[in-house]
Amino acid sequence: MQGTISCARNYNMTTTVGESLRPLSLKTQGNGERVRMVVEENAVIVIGRRGCCMCHVVRRLLLGLGVNPAVLEIDEEREDEVLSELENIGVQGGGGTVKLPAVYVGGRLFGGLDRVMATHISGELVPILKEVGALWL
């Protein structure tokens, strides 16, 4: 079963619980604050284009590790606006240029699919996820 909610700017937010999806609350003041708040409130969030296969791969990997990532799917016409907001968050969090799919861990830009896969293969991903409270094992 899948559930999403739309906010004013056509961003759809979902968070996974096992194989089901439940909506996240997006009640904030401004449009830039909406994305910032969602990034800061979730231990792990995956942000990508609607229907992006790489976003799906990241999500499935994290689910396989026992992490329940929030997922932000954006429409192509809003992509530039969201990327601009994410780069502002990334600058404060020590990040840089944001490319989709983007994974934020502990409110900071972690990277994309390549970084997630590389840290998983090297065995560094699980300790990072434990450190931010996304895993309790």
UniProtKB/Swiss-Prot annotation:
UniProt short sequence motif Responsive for interaction with TGA factors, positions renumbered to this chain: 134-137
Induction context: Up-regulated by salicylic acid (SA).
Keyword Cytoplasm: yes
Record's subcellular location: Cytoplasm; Nucleus
One of the protein's GO biological processes: negative regulation of transcription by RNA polymerase II
Pfam families: Glutaredoxin
InterPro entries from the UniProt entry: GlrX-like_pln_2, Glutaredoxin, Thioredoxin-like_sf
Ranges of residues in domain Glutaredoxin: 32-136
Example of a GO cellular component annotation carried by this entry: nucleus
Family classification: Belongs to the glutaredoxin family. CC-type subfamily.
NCBIfam families: GlrX-like_plant
Subunit structure: Interacts with TGA2 and TGA6.
Protein role: Has a glutathione-disulfide oxidoreductase activity in the presence of NADPH and glutathione reductase. Reduces low molecular weight disulfides and proteins.
Protein name in UniProt: Glutaredoxin-C9
Species assigned in the record: Arabidopsis thaliana
Source taxonomy: Eukaryota, Viridiplantae, Streptophyta, Embryophyta, Tracheophyta
